[in-house]
Amino acid sequence: MVPVVALVGRPNVGKSTLFNRLTRTRDALVADFPGLTRDRKYGRAEVEGREFICIDTGGIDGTEDGVETRMAEQSLLAIEEADVVLFMVDARAGLMPADEAIAKHLRSREKPTFLVANKTDGLDPDQAVVDFYSLGLGEIYPIAASHGRGVLSLLEHVLLPWMDDVAPQEEVDEDAEYWAQFEAEQNGEEAPEDDFDPQSLPIKLAIVGRPNVGKSTLTNRILGEERVVVYDMPGTTRDSIYIPMERDEREYVLIDTAGVRKRGKITDAVEKFSVIKTLQAIEDANVVLLVIDAREGISDQDLSLLGFILNSGRSLVIVVNKWDGLSQEVKEQVKETLDFRLGFIDFARVHFISALHGSGVGNLFESVREAYDSSTRRVSTAMLTRIMTMAVEDHQPPLVRGRRVKLKYAHTGGYNPPIVVIHGNQVKDLPDSYKRYLMNYFRKSLEVMGTPIRIQFKEGENPYANKRNTLTPTQMRKRKRLMKHIKKSK
């Protein structure tokens, strides 16, 4: 499960500045979700190749009424669901009563908490943070979020220790791997593969969407149609429920973020919406069903969730619910709006259903399996290189400083989403338009549907880079004789 980091503190201590600095590395989508405090933000960030979800909880005002009553309900939820809490204070303003009230609350939660003193630029860090030791939260990490000073040290000392259980990816010699696989394919041999068999694993399916769009109804319709005994399999400490099921002799695991239990236990008309659960479900899923209310249309919140799904690289099926009862004229208007606002998602299937009455629900699984198969499909290095060569023959890369960008070969870089790694010279100078052309060419050639595809470029190493051209003693003597001859001839 992707770790969650919550930024907590008084207003104007620099939480949003640190949030923007952390999430900028991933160019993360920052979204304000209706129904929460207006300044709450969520984003994806990365440290040394390891991803985490970052939450700006907004300002917490610890007044005489008590910090617990002044905290927004969703801010409390974010703290409870976080793996690590970064408690930020203002080093310039000094220790405030609100800081003490917040610290008292955090100590009572027994949550891993680290004290971060911001705005230490221009100050003696040791003197600036001395008063904050009275909060009893241990070591203090001085930073200047606006300039980035101390942020890297903070990440290394706080976040990385909590991610040690995530095994680092092994570095491989990609050139050697390419030629070994290419030679095996040329000789008619099977290229060596690992033990990963996507068809032997259950498909993890997350159903996400805004409150009251019908996620619970759709989940229960799916389970009810299959007449499966529903039991709650422990998922995470954050109360996401993993529900195993089977359909057409294929195993699935529904990731339930709406708190749905057995049919008889559903009493609330409106689903309890947890942004954290939704984001984590997206990260943990293989395929995401994004449910949209046909009667309300596409909202900014729908687009925010969609952006997070795309950034996560997950396979996607768009489900337009509550389709029944709409007039033909309204249906045409909804379809036009979908085409206009979702025109950039040309790889995702769109289904119009009624979860309440069950119409169209059965067809969802065909698209789910198609998306999963596309995202986990094995493609040989030779085939990817051939496709790349055909793309270059159809449309040459542009000239860069008078020289043509050269693409050498391509190989698989990962799955879910499928990643194609292209090696070449000057590839970092390729314009975005040509990168999009290559992505679309690979998608069309591989017939990838239901999942995004990513293209990564790697520059070929120059063995003479950073080396000086020094002459040998023999070359030096020859050069002197040549220079003398040139001078005499003049």
UniProtKB/Swiss-Prot annotation:
User: Residue ranges of the EngA-type G domain?
Assistant: 3-166, 203-376
The processes (GO biological process) annotated in the record are: ribosome biogenesis
Q: Which residues bind GTP 2?
A: 209-216, 256-260, 321-324
**Entry binding sites for GTP 1:** 9-16, 56-60, 118-121
Q: What is this protein called?
A: GTPase Der
Q: Where is the KH-like domain?
A: 377-461
Q: Which InterPro entries match?
A: G_ENGA, GTP-bd, GTPase_Der, KH_dom-like, KH_dom-like_a/b, P-loop_NTPase, Small_GTP-bd
Q: Which Gene3D superfamilies match?
A: 3.30.300.20, P-loop containing nucleotide triphosphate hydrolases
What keywords sit in the KW lines? GTP-binding, Nucleotide-binding, Repeat, Ribosome biogenesis
Question: Domain of life of the organism in this record?
Answer: Bacteria
Q: Where are the transmembrane segments?
A: none
Q: Name one Pfam family in it.
A: MMR_HSR1
State one molecular function term (GO): GTP binding
Q: How does it assemble?
A: Associates with the 50S ribosomal subunit.
Per the entry, what this protein does is: GTPase that plays an essential role in the late steps of ribosome biogenesis.
| Assigned protein family | Belongs to the TRAFAC class TrmE-Era-EngA-EngB-Septin-like GTPase superfamily. EngA (Der) GTPase family.
